[in-house]
Amino acid sequence: MTSFKLVKYTPRIKKKKSGLRKLARKVPTDRLLKFERVFKAQKRIHMSVFKVQRVLDEIRWRYYEETVMILNLMPYRASYPILKLVYSAAANATHYRDFDKANLFITKAEVSRSTIMNKFRPRARGRSSPIKKTMCHITIVLNIVKKSK
């Protein structure tokens, strides 16, 4: 007979790779001004979180002008509300904070789930089936980058 040893199982926790590594490749972190940022959020957009997420993954850690160009050329329906949101955030940055649009950089672009609107569709024999309309919240953070000397 073989004997078994009882060992307490401890799961391995994978460390999340921070987004600053990506950022360091494009913009050195010492050039990124920490507290010079503009937040803009849009709530209750009638779109799935997953559809918005694939567009936000493309524009995260990019400059403003490059982001606008990418969003104009994307074939997805989610790119239009995100484009409006980025335009609005950049307009707020130039109007209220006197930032230059050429130095704006998207440091955070995230989407979160909102409420689900339930409707009912009439079906055969007096039955009904639910229609679930999902909504989401989008948050964009624009940061200013110092000019390199």
Swiss-Prot record:
Compartments where located: Plastid, Chloroplast
One CC-aspect GO term: chloroplast
InterPro entries according to UniProt: Ribosomal_uL22, Ribosomal_uL22_bac/chlpt-type, Ribosomal_uL22_bac/org-type, Ribosomal_uL22_CS, Ribosomal_uL22_sf
GO molecular function annotations of the record: rRNA binding; structural constituent of ribosome
Highest taxon of source: Eukaryota
Pfam families: Ribosomal_L22
GO biological process annotation, one example: translation
UniProt keywords, alphabetically: Chloroplast, Plastid, Ribonucleoprotein, Ribosomal protein, RNA-binding, rRNA-binding
Coiled coil regions in record: none
PROSITE patterns: RIBOSOMAL_L22
Family the UniProt entry places it in: Belongs to the universal ribosomal protein uL22 family.
Subunit relationships: Part of the 50S ribosomal subunit.
Role noted for this protein: This protein binds specifically to 23S rRNA. The globular domain of the protein is located near the polypeptide exit tunnel on the outside of the subunit, while an extended beta-hairpin is found that lines the wall of the exit tunnel in the center of the 70S ribosome.
Protein name: Large ribosomal subunit protein uL22c
Organism: Oryza sativa subsp. japonica (Rice)
Lineage of the organism: Eukaryota, Viridiplantae, Streptophyta, Embryophyta, Tracheophyta
